[in-house]
Amino acid sequence: MKFSAIIILLFALASCKGINSVLKNPDPKYKLRMAEQYYAKKKWVYAQQLYEDVMPFFRGQPEFEDIYYKYAYTAYNQKDYLNAENLFKTYLEIYPNSPKAEEVDFMRAYTFYKQSPKAELDQTNSLKAIGMFQTFINTHPGSAKNKEAGAIIDELRAKLEVKDARAAQLYYDLGQFRAAAVAFNALLENYPDTQKADEYKLMSIKSYYQFAELSIEEKKVERFGKVIEECNDFVDRFPQSGLTKEVEQYSTQSQNNLKRYTNEPAKTTT
């Protein structure tokens, strides 16, 4: 084990000596050749150092575009996504009509995707990725990358849905029933293709019911009426749902509460 560590250390020192020797060489064309070799061998740190060193010399020359393109990828391949995004952006600004522009445009969006965190964390990068991938699809309607871009959008939207659903459930668990009802209804509006639409609607009904139960007497008629409206909307929107029976129970209980507080027959559920 100790011998292996020594070998690794000696190899690292030799590599450092090699790159330092190249960097000290006054010939930028030689440095570029070495950068290309390091790039081909996926030695991203060394390639990055050399590309950065020779860029001032090759600026304005035909080689510069490829240098900058690969320089951006050295950052990406080191998982320095923040820097890579900025480099891809600059490449597109300098070479908007390049044959590589479509690829780089995709990769710029992809850097935000790679920075997308777990669902419980801030989703700013997820939102940026969604927006940029959608722009990519619109800008490059015939791209072979559009299928992948669409799949990533779906993946990120599913993550956003999980985050929003957890937030709505937290409102409910904390007894903030009005906020929970609004949040569950917002899920239906923001994620119309969700597979959990009837579940969200049921949770909205439960939230409105609990909110009505805890209301002062002067507000109960209005708020139990709201529960009945939500129940009717559920039946209209999800006629085949397996949750209908539970919804009907909330509707019946709310009608009984209306009778109790108004002393008159409640409206029949449609």
Each model region followed by its residue ranges:
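Acidic, polar-rich low-complexity tracts and alpha-helical solenoid repeat scaffolds
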Residues: A12-T270
